[in-house]
Amino acid sequence: DYVGGLVGLNYYSTVSNSFYDKTKYTGDGVGNNPTHPGATGKTTQEMSYGGTFKNASWDIIADSSVTSLTPVIKWDSINNKYVWAIAPLALAYTLGDKTTTYNGTTQNLSTLYNNSTNIFGTNHSFIDLSKYKFQVAGNDVTGYKDADIYNNIKLVNDSDSFAILNASGNTDGKLIINKKDLTISNITANNKTY
């Protein structure tokens, strides 16, 4: 008997761009072919994110009226066809505090906050941070140069149609740029008065 996360036994058929939940089933995707390239194991969280399927060339849309955290078939009345639909993944973010020292150049927030695991948590390490941007008081911010404390840095979804950021429960960022110590050498003082 062959058991697989997606297909138990595959003879003379094609399996491509397909997924199974490796959190729920830890075996192979295709029972009689453990290295089959068409059946990829994804975590439960990855299976609830539409980008997983879109990146595999699925015709899928994010639809807030869908309550399923896995893709469902839905009629698209605008385009008169069936499509895959999935609820947008709700995410909370944690930016937290970052400290650096003035170096004469702009310190980019995308360099300081560059790890999706730290920002969205271990279960959402697959989120592409290039689809998000930073804002302060509703204005886009890419970085800061001068020594100062910069508070209330928020993460904003810029182009990820398969995720939404929660309105509450997020931890905004704070960037502290410390002054650089000044080193002075080879100075001669004239006209000294004591």
Residue ranges, per PLM feature:
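Predominantly extracellular beta-rich ligand-binding scaffolds that present long acidic/polar faces
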Residues: 1-92
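Solvent-exposed beta-strand/loop surfaces, strongest in extracytoplasmic domains of secreted
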Residues: 75-81, 86-194
